[in-house]
Design a protein with these regions (language model features):
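Residues on the lipid-exposed face of transmembrane beta-strands in outer-membrane beta-barrel proteins
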Residues: 31-37, 86-90, 125-129, 175-181, ...
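Transmembrane beta-strands of outer-membrane beta-barrel pores
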Residues: 1-3, 39-41, 50-56, 102-108, ...
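C-terminal beta-signal and adjacent terminal beta-strands/loops
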Residues: 146, 190-191, 248-257, 278-324
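Repeated loop/turn-to-beta-strand initiation elements of outer-membrane beta-barrel proteins
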Residues: 41-44, 95-98, 133-137, 186-190, ...
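Membrane-embedded beta-barrel scaffold of Gram-negative outer-membrane proteins
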Residues: 91, 97-101, 117-182, 190-206
Length: 324
């Protein structure tokens, strides 16, 4: 391209691209039915969803960069699934309730020959306490995958083809905890929130892929934190808000494995502090400021692609919100 009179104009035509010379299209439709039944302290919810996806990949190859159609490889794929679900909520008292459910999970495959859809059965159950200024939740979950899909991403150590591959049987389970409170002193409200998630993952079959290499039964799924916690501390007074956020992520694997984590295949745990403030000048104008990684902590977020990737350094962002 060349600049002429302040505008960019084509100068020397280049050759058409020859890498990933393909077009992929999908046609999908879905429908669902939902029913809710309430009687006394009980609320039951049941439903079902139907998904139908047809895919077609047309690969014109490097020999036909202009996509004339003389050389073309077509790869179709199709997936359809019924996805039932059931949930319940029962109030033990005006503040305490139990909840749970079981649902079928689904994700469509890519336009790859013999590629299977992702399907799973997801269970959850727990308790919730809720009052005017206090809310506490404790939820356990377990996802049983009959077939999990993985993606060939550079960010996950693959070749970056974006193609999906069959992982097979896997399990993901854990627990979540949430606590929220809004104590008030005079005219100042102090919103507080604490969350914690524990996640355990496990491969239940063996396979090999370009992205993950050799995977064995019992290996953990990469790039999933086993421990993650977040705390939010705030103060609100009329049109002014001040918030401090504390983030903790435990160590995680960057390739499938089990047992002790090798240093070369681990993202170490890290603790980050963020802050934000908001001032409402009038009914139309609000000013905001956000500080990310206030302590300028040095931490890692990935080992892919092509080596270590650092987390966000200290950053300061300001803005204005206008409403009319």
């Amino acid at each position: 391209f060349a600049m002429k009179d302040g505008r960019m104009q084509p100068f020397l035509p280049g050759l058409p691209g020859s890498n990933s010379n393909r077009i992929t299209e999908a046609h999908a439709w879905s429908g669902y039915a939902l029913a809710k039944w309430t009687r006394g302290a009980w609320t039951l919810t049941a439903g079902a969803r139907y998904e139908d996806v047809s895919l077609l990949k047309r690969d014109f190859t490097a020999a036909d960069p202009r996509r004339s159609g003389k050389v073309r490889i077509e790869t179709p794929n199709h997936a359809a699934a019924w996805l039932p679900g059931f949930g319940f909520n029962v109030k033990l008292t005006s503040q305490l309730s139990l909840l749970g459910g079981v649902h079928r999970g689904f994700a469509p495959p890519s336009a790859t020959l013999y590629q299977k859809a992702e399907n799973s059965t997801n269970f959850e159950g727990g308790a919730r306490w809720s009052s005017r200024r206090l809310k506490i939740e404790a939820i356990g979950f377990f996802n049983n995958y009959r077939n999990m899909l993985g993606s060939d991403l550079l960010a996950a150590g693959g070749q970056g083809t974006l193609e999906q591959f069959n992982v097979g049987k896997a399990a993901v389970g854990g627990a979540e905890f949430l606590a929220q409170a809004q104590p008030r002193i005079g005219h100042v409200t102090f919103p507080l929130q604490l969350t914690y998630t524990y996640t355990h993952t496990e491969m239940r079959n063996e396979f090999s892929s370009d992205a993950w290499g050799d995977v064995h039964v019992g290996d953990e799924i990469p790039y999933i934190f086993r421990h993650a916690a977040n705390a939010q501390l705030g103060a609100e007074y009329r049109g002014y808000e001040l918030n401090v956020g504390l983030r903790y992520n435990g160590a995680m694997r960057t390739v499938p494995g089990q047992g002790a984590m090798p240093k070369s295949e681990t993202i170490p745990s890290h603790f980050i502090v963020d802050a934000s403030a908001k001032a409402r000048l009038n009914r139309h104008v609000t000013l905001t400021i956000n500080a990310i990684n206030v302590t300028n902590a040095r931490y890692l977020v990935s080992r892919h692609p092509s080596g270590l990737r650092a987390g966000h350094p200290f950053g300061l962002y300001g803005g204005a919100i206008f409403n009319w």
